[in-house]
């Protein structure tokens, strides 16, 4: 093995941690993955053990080295990308978390979010953070931990505790406590950060009674945050020089550098992000305004629509209903369905995300007849993912007065050709599937490599990630609109069913 240099991306996700080593062409040299425990203390609560996450990251770093034969001193820089919003509070001295990490999906702080809404803070939070008040974001999770762990508020006020999203936790661990930092994209998801003024918002901190002393320093997405402590990186002292929340990292990995460019990642959930350039644009239709990335002294904003259930609907077909043995099989069954698409599945298992934001909604099925088959049901579940994406793309076009010409896609479910073709049909636009579907990790690697000169500039990156396949719409307009009208009716009925009885 020659002394070629590489970039390592650490991709810390909701169900597993991965380390991927990339070469100068942006190609994957090796990767390692490790799942970790999902903790469900009560219905609707989701937690992780932050130490177990750290151990899984250590394990995959080793795995990537072993698989490739690359040595720690051949890693030029490390990029980190992470599940966003998930919240850790730990002891500054011992480095031990004082409670489990509360995961982005967890609804345990929903009563706190409702309280803030009822107190009339909706507009204020939206204008400052670009977000809607929801248990999804970190703010109420921090408040919950400080409320439920004995003495935590007092210790936080004394400066004995630290808060971080997963990126912050990993950098703190990798540098052995030398760096307590986060980046623009992760800070923007806490509901504590003023995305216009680019600073922690004192008024929001006061409303929530969260001491400023526990917050990390906010930095750009591409700069050196610190170096690995040799005993945490198998002898290597390597700069950690790129960082972004998973969806923003995918935006960067998809090379969506121009305003108006849009990407969708079909993962557990589905996250559609549009680069809106250097102007912050507040949505009037329940999309989130967030920071895409900050690089070279400039900050690029984004509009985002979050769908909570996408790929996990296919997992539900596999694990919950046992209709398929593996996810790819869903494509075959969908093609074998010969009904007229009259079945609609609304997979609101954890409520409805953008643009509805109805946390009481639950999954429902419409249009069943005696003739409905397993194939029809599977097809309707795949189609539900595409319909939800259309909800958001339509909203984005209204908000920005921009006609979206092409949707760049990545993520596991983007491998499903039936879903991609139906997505093109129901949107009426081209779907460009990335050749390298590792766009999230690649985005983190690009950010890290740029800041140490491994790649020269954005123009060099543009040569690296080509489109793999283009799906063009082939459905006629009236059929498309008829199907989508049925979906809107199904969502409306789902929301009526979810209405809380007086």
From Swiss-Prot:
Sn-glycerol 3-phosphate binds at residues 14, 84-85, 136, 246. The modification Phosphohistidine is found at residue 232. It holds the Pfam family FGGY_C. Activated by phosphorylation and inhibited by fructose 1,6-bisphosphate (FBP). It comes from the Bacteria. Gene3D superfamilies: 3.30.420.40. Its EC number is 2.7.1.30. It catalyses: glycerol + ATP = sn-glycerol 3-phosphate + ADP + H(+). Keywords: ATP-binding, Glycerol metabolism, Kinase, Nucleotide-binding, Phosphoprotein, Transferase. Glycerol binds at residues 84-85, 136, 246-247. The phosphoenolpyruvate-dependent sugar phosphotransferase system (PTS), including enzyme I, and histidine-containing protein (HPr) are required for the phosphorylation, which leads to the activation of the enzyme. ATP binds at residues 14-16, 268, 311, 315, 412. ADP binds at residues 14, 18, 268, 311, 412, 416. Signal peptide: none annotated. GO terms for molecular function: ATP binding; glycerol kinase activity. GO terms for cellular component: cytosol. GO terms for biological process: glycerol catabolic process; glycerol metabolic process; glycerol-3-phosphate metabolic process. Key enzyme in the regulation of glycerol uptake and metabolism. Catalyzes the phosphorylation of glycerol to yield sn-glycerol 3-phosphate. Belongs to the FGGY kinase family. Homotetramer and homodimer (in equilibrium). This is Glycerol kinase. It comes from Streptococcus pneumoniae (strain ATCC 700669 / Spain 23F-1). The lineage of its organism: Bacteria, Bacillati, Bacillota, Bacilli, Lactobacillales. The gene is glpK.
């Amino acid at each position: 093995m020659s002394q070629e240099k590489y970039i390592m991306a650490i991709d810390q996700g909701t169900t597993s941690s991965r380390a991927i080593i990339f070469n100068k062409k942006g190609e994957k040299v090796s990767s390692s993955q490790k799942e970790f425990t999902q903790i469900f203390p009560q219905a609707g609560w989701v937690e992780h053990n932050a130490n177990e996450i750290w151990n899984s990251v250590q394990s995959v770093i080793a795995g990537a080295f072993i698989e490739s034969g690359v040595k720690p001193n051949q890693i030029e820089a490390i990029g980190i990308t992470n599940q966003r919003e998930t919240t850790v509070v730990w002891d500054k001295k011992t480095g031990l978390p004082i409670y489990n990490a509360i995961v982005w999906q967890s609804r345990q702080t929903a009563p706190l979010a409702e309280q803030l809404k009822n107190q009339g803070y909706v507009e204020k939070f939206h204008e400052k953070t670009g977000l809607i008040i929801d248990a999804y974001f970190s703010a109420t999770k921090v408040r919950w931990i400080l409320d439920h762990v004995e003495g935590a508020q007092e210790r936080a006020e004394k400066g004995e505790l630290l808060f971080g999203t997963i990126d912050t936790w990993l950098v703190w661990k990798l540098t052995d406590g030398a760096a307590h930092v986060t980046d623009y994209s992760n800070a923007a998801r806490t509901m504590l950060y003023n995305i216009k003024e680019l600073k922690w918002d004192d008024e929001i901190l006061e409303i929530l009674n969260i001491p400023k002393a526990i917050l990390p320093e906010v930095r750009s997405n591409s700069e050196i945050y610190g170096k690995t402590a040799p005993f945490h990186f198998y002898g290597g002292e390597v700069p950690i020089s790129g960082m972004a929340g998973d969806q923003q990292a995918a935006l960067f990995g998809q090379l969506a550098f121009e305003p108006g460019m849009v990407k969708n990642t079909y993962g557990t959930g589905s996250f559609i992000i549009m680069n809106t350039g250097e102007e912050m644009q507040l949505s009037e239709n329940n999309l989130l305004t967030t920071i895409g990335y900050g690089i070279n002294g400039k900050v690029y904003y984004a509009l985002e629509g979050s769908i909570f259930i996408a790929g996990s609907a296919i997992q539900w077909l596999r694990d919950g209903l046992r209709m398929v043995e593996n996810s790819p099989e869903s494509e075959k069954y969908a093609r074998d369905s010969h009904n007229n698409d009259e079945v609609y599945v609304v997979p609101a298992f954890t409520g409805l995300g953008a643009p509805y934001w109805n946390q009481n909604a639950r999954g429902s099925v419409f249009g069943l007849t005696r003739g409905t088959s397993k194939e029809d049901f599977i097809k309707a579940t795949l189609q539900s993912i595409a319909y939800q994406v259309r909800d958001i793309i339509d909203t984005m076009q209204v908000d920005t007065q921009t006609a979206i010409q092409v949707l760049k896609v990545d993520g596991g479910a983007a491998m499903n050709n039936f879903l991609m073709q139906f997505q093109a049909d129901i949107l009426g636009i081209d779907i460009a599937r990335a050749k390298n579907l590792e766009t999230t990790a690649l985005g983190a690697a690009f950010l890290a490599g740029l800041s140490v000169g491994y790649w020269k500039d954005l123009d060099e990156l543009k040569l690296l990630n080509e489109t793999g396949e283009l799906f063009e719409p082939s459905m006629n307009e009236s059929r498309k609109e008829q199907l989508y009208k049925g979906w809107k009716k199904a969502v409306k009925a789902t929301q009526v069913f979810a209405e809380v009885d007086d």
